[in-house]
Design a protein with these regions (language model features):
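Membrane-interfacial terminal anchoring regions of lipid-handling membrane enzymes
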Residues: 1-385
Length: 385
């Protein structure tokens, strides 16, 4: 899977990797089991983590059945994935799945899973699901299993999520809701078009894909503070495991990478107006970056000049037609607001400034107060698309 991941990512992003406590990761005993718990931003998450961990470990993922089509089935199997039916209620199926998870855990297989259980539709971190977490934890009940299990929080963020418009449509209009195959088709189209651009020398990457690894959590230590939890009946056990799931999500949220586009989106939306002086945007970005530094947030290229960070973000905002320049001001286009909210939401929990809520709804694509813009080929012209 490494070679494929490398090709795909080089077509799309510049990858940044950082560690909250690399020494703690290195101290995990080799014989213990490592489980990476990740937030779920994009279907590209699998590829990003496979690429980052290629020389350290092969990771077994739980992937939905939507991926069991050629060539995706081959791709995900090359990353060590197994396929599950999400939302399937058949008890026998879950009994078999639980035994499979126990088997790979007892044999020391490194695993990766997404506690949220689905892609984020609005950009925010979602509530955790408990199924796979419960299965992994209950491996500790096996008398022959004498290892520890370490949960490693992994936070992923992008300057561009390939499926962002499709994800937002799920919150906009029920009849227009795309299926998972439609989302994957969007990703495949991007890969194809970028492959053509690579051959013709016109390749432009979509900014940063950033991955941060957090401080690992020892399951044995956690269970020592909650003795007898795994022996409880399921209806009593799961509420207790919610505390572990919440701890994982808290750790993930604390290390979410702040790439240029989410930072710029948060700054733009914090004003609550359509036209904003560019100097004010840069000042607000600088203020937000200082705040992020104060809470030890992981800011990508945090030492760069704020104008440089803005320029990197602006290339994406302009290319996506989310905003245009009007003299010395930046104008947020109405159709761009939901996408800006999507990216700003990814770091909203780290910031004191809350942008005005802009519901994901079609009525917000028309803004009577938007100034009439001059047409220019580079800006996309008119009132946006």
């Amino acid at each position: 899977g490494y070679n494929l991941a490398k090709v795909v990512l080089n077509l799309l992003y510049r990858v940044t990797v950082d560690y909250q406590d690399e020494a703690a990761l290195e101290r995990i005993p080799k014989r213990d089991v490592v489980v990476y718990a990740m937030n779920h931003r994009s279907n590209v998450d699998y590829v990003v983590v496979a690429y980052v961990l290629a020389y350290g470990a092969h990771v077994s993922y739980a992937v939905g059945e939507w991926a069991r089509v050629w060539p995706l089935e081959y791709v995900f199997k090359s990353f060590g994935s197994y396929f599950i039916r999400r939302g399937f209620r058949e008890p026998l199926y879950h009994a078999v799945l639980e035994q499979y998870v126990h088997l790979i855990t007892k044999n020391g297989v490194t695993q990766g899973f997404f506690p949220e259980g689905r892609l984020s539709r609005d950009g925010r971190l979602g509530s955790p699901k408990l199924g796979l977490l419960d299965y992994v934890c209950r491996t500790m009940l096996d008398p022959a299993f004498d290892r520890d299990i370490w949960f490693v929080p992994v936070a992923i963020n992008f300057d561009r999520v390939l499926e962002d418009r499709a994800l937002i449509r799920e919150l906009v209009d029920e009849p227009d809701r795309p299926g998972r195959l439609a989302q994957l088709w969007t990703v495949m189209k991007y890969l194809g078009s970028n492959a053509v651009r690579l051959v013709t020398g016109r390749l432009k990457r979509y900014g940063r894909a950033a991955v941060n690894f957090g401080t690992p959590i020892s399951l044995r230590e956690w269970l020592a503070s909650a003795p007898g939890v795994l022996q409880l009946p399921k209806e009593q056990r799961l509420p207790q495991l919610e505390r572990l799931a919440a701890l994982l999500m808290e750790r993930i949220g604390a290390i979410i990478p702040v790439t240029p586009v989410p930072l710029a989106a948060a700054a733009l939306l914090s004003f609550g107006q359509t036209m904003i002086p560019k100097a004010a945007v840069l000042d607000r970005m600088d203020q937000l970056r200082d705040r992020l530094g104060a809470v030890n947030a992981k800011v990508v290229r945090g030492g760069a000049r704020i104008r440089e960070v803005w320029d990197r973000a602006w290339r994406m905002l302009r290319m996506r037609r989310l905003a245009v320049e009007e003299g010395d001001s930046v104008v947020v286009l109405p159709r761009g607001r939901p996408l800006l909210e999507f990216y700003a939401n990814s770091i909203a929990h780290l910031l004191p400034i809350r942008s005005p809520r802009v519901p994901f709804h079609k009525t917000h694509e028309v803004d009577a107060d938007l100034p009439r813009l001059r047409r220019s080929g580079e800006d996309g012209g008119g009132r946006g698309r």
